[in-house]
């Protein structure tokens, strides 16, 4: 695997070709392995290299290959990570068009792509379109799956985020609570995603001035994060800071100083 380690440290085109040819020959172009390598490159933050990799793979596929829609989706993720939001939307739209031609209207891929499109609109500050896309994802998943499908937790969380940004705090709270309820069904009690949900709910209570409820949810978040994350993880530091600010608003300056300093 030395060829892979070498290539991941370089963005040069000849290194990319070397890596791609190696993977194609070793794994006979098995989709799972090629996808895994592309994901590894992307997750390392080497977005330009990931884009070249996906494009090279795309160029070798016949026009009717079922992997094309997946590659469009992955290119959309790369463009999103690079902050190229309009390009990301174009890739996602291409992926969506293929899925709508080749799958039933309630297929999981279609709902997931609507969610991805919503994420990009949210980053562009277009909350209306983001909410529209998230609601489409929810509607499709309700038709095809149980209302407590794990992905619904993500959709509800995203809707809650939009409502919080729009200062519709009670609506935000409702969707964050729905997201948390689903996560509890599938995740271990100390999973970091539960810590995120408690933190999000605490943030909304903060906006509503419900400081005792804020501290309750921040404490729950902190307990989970201390168990599941490295000691120096920024989410832990953020939770301490948030709790310190709440104590400051409650005029408990001693506790505030301990947490903030």
Per-range role (PLM):
Residues 35-43, 66-81, 108-123, 150-165, ...:
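Conserved alpha-helical positions within TPR/SEL1-like repeat arrays
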Residues 17-33, 61-67:
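TPR-adjacent "capping" and linker segments in tetratricopeptide-repeat scaffold/adaptor proteins
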Residues 25, 63, 102-105, 147, ...:
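Structural signature of alpha-solenoid helical repeat scaffolds
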Residues 57-59, 96-101, 138-143, 180-185, ...:
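Amphipathic alpha-helical segments of tetratricopeptide repeats
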Residues 29-60, 77-83:
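Alpha-helical segment of the N-proximal tetratricopeptide repeat
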